[in-house]
Amino acid sequence: MHSSALRDRAARFVVDSDPGRLRLRSAAGTTLSLVLAIIALLAFTRFTHQPVTIAMLGAIVAMQSSVAVKDKHQRDRVITTLLLPLPAVGAVTLAAILAPFDWVADVGFIAVLFTAVWVRRFGPRGNALGMVAFMSYFFALFIHATPAQIPILAAAIGVGIAATLTVRTMVFPDRPRAEVLHLVRALRGVSITVLDAVTKDRKKHDLVAVRRRLDRLGETGLMIDDWLDRHDAAQTLSVTSDELAVRVFDAQISVEQLAGLLWNLDSGDEWTGGLVDAIIALRMCLQDKPSEEELRAARKSAAAAADRAEMSAPGGVATVVAYRAVQAHLAIHHITTNALGTATTSEPEPATPTDEATSGLDPSTKAAVQVAVATSAATILGELISPDRWYWAVLTAFLVFTGVSTRGEILTRVGHRIVGTIAGVAAGVLLATLIGQNPPAQIIVLVFCVFCAFYLVTVAYAWLTFFVTVVLAMLYGLLGNFSVQVLELRIAETVAGGAVGIASAYFVFTTGTRATFIEKANDYFDRLTEVIDAGVESVVAPGGETDLVAETRSLDNALQEVVKTGKPLQMGPAVRSRRGAQRLVRGLQAGNRSAHALARAGVNAARADPESAPPEATAVALRKAADHVCDTVAGVKKMVAGESANAPEKPTTAMLLEVMTTSEIPPGPVRAAVRALNNLDRTLTEVTSRV
């Protein structure tokens, strides 16, 4: 029993930390591409009597081509992969020709780095082509490639990319049905963890755990929305994409609302039998493979509990919300169990061109100039530290700009890289001592570290650096060149490269962290206002069409950008500023769940009969209350920008009370909208008072 519980806990951890197994799939694909490339290239070098360094280049290209290609659709990913030999062979050729001319080769390297960043303006394909060109030039210098070796190096590149293409199209092809089933299973798994956080040991609730699990629930919902952007649900499941989006939205929001209601129940009071029955029924629906009999019993039990619920009591409201969650997850069970057996990949819709014009230099050009300056300085510093290992400083100066743009993000990235390098050196020395000259064991550790590096890279960049450093230690051991002094040089070169990267970020086309944070926050507040307006209009005019689900997902994506750009501010040296950023982000995350509830009220109203519209007086009062909440949003927006905001003349609570007194309002979208507006306003008001 104990081992079974441990297995269940481990399985739940994997599902929670990697919804849909996307990280597992990506890391496994990269590792398998590397292994296939190494096997093929070792055979190739043995047959052609070439040094093992030739195999190293092909293996690195295979790994990089697996990691760097991130086009949204499978067809685009294959096309990008097929294009990769062009920049790879071109970069190797340039490096081999320029290598005899010391400083000219350095200038060529910096030119390649500049171009690799500049082409990011062309989206994922440009980024992939640039990264592969950079890595190819780098390793051509590393192995001291000569012009005579260009044909054999080109062949090694072809073998490496062929290995990646084989894995991408044959071992891990695009499987829309399997992917969405994993994501839906993850949605259920995360929903159970949310329930556990608010139902088990009620007297010792862990608020941090509840927030973390609710955030994970929202992230899983966005992952399903991303799947819907890439695939047509009608070709894989028994519903259209719009219908699945609504079902998932219902399931997510109902669990969020239920968690909030259960959290606010008095921990000293016993729950009513109806609420307990509804929670048990919901747990049954959240199991992976319940039988049809179990699902029917869960529906019947939850419906009976909702019929008996006293809506004037908080426990009664929670019971009804639990029943709605049961209905939502039952619908998803029906959709996934009736999924079609096969699916054809739909052609991606062409991107809609935008007319937005940006002033000044393109961000990719600014970043390219920053990288050129940083890598030029890193070349000089790196050669002063070690004429043979200078490229590590250049590598660090380049990589700290990958995927980030603000000063704070780059500073954080440098910190992660230095910490990961130091820890990796320590681990590499320890493993080298324990393993010794044992090629099979060294190869196993090397492959394991590659998998861990790319499985954990999205958790923290330090993990990638840590495992890559261990890989280098194993690689030097295999080549017979391992020494502690070499790894110590890596630390020094990493620090030097990180330092010039930070200097370049602060003094060359600097992008302020706070300014970027304010920009992202303003975008979020604008989208929040749109959701408030659209939700209230749908409630006061039921039975119409609404795009609230898509608008809410856009709101969630905007919030993710706020959280991402706010992370450096939450780790700053100033205690007051750090805590203010933390409270603001937490407040926006809490308020976002109230916006979800309002959007759900609007979606439910859109399904209702137009005759169920509230009286005109109620509609007018609700619109006024919504305008008042929008004013509160505007006040928070001013506060974030450092401006002063005027206090409202009339409390929002009083205006919402006027809505309820205009007529006898039965349970339904209007009440749900009033409750959501009240919670949203209260949360945002608390943000302004505490930040």
Language-model segments: which ranges?
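A cross-kingdom feature marking solvent-exposed beta-strand/loop segments within repeated
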Residues: 226-246, 406-407, 431, 568-583
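Structured cytosolic domains appended to multi-pass membrane proteins
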Residues: 568-613, 617
